[in-house]
């Protein structure tokens, strides 16, 4: 159980780092973290681009909105156990059943899906980010359901089934 907790902690820190970068980029771009102040400014910022390779003399432009969405989505991938950061969820079932039920029910794993849904006005301005959300969600859905079919331990079946259902929800957001 200790190894599972360590894995869950480390994988979620990867997601948290992406989420933190997304929040930082929102603050730098909009000057606020309040929904009521950010969403009205979306039309003014929608055309802004950043040259990611400018410091190296290259040229690769990406929309600021797309960068924000992708960083926020990395956070959602970690919290909602989407591929490739899904490895922690099945192992988290090693704990006591009440704790496992809390993790797999409506608490932690749905937070990432809720965040993507709550930021829908932002994600709607980035077709690239919407495609990434749909593809990752669909992949997670398929992988989770396929692995669930091969499991013999009921706790792992529930874990992979939860993974698949989270993939459905994430795909619907994309």
Task: Give the location of each predicted region.
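Hydrophobic transmembrane alpha-helices and their helix-loop junctions in integral membrane proteins
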Residues: 1-174
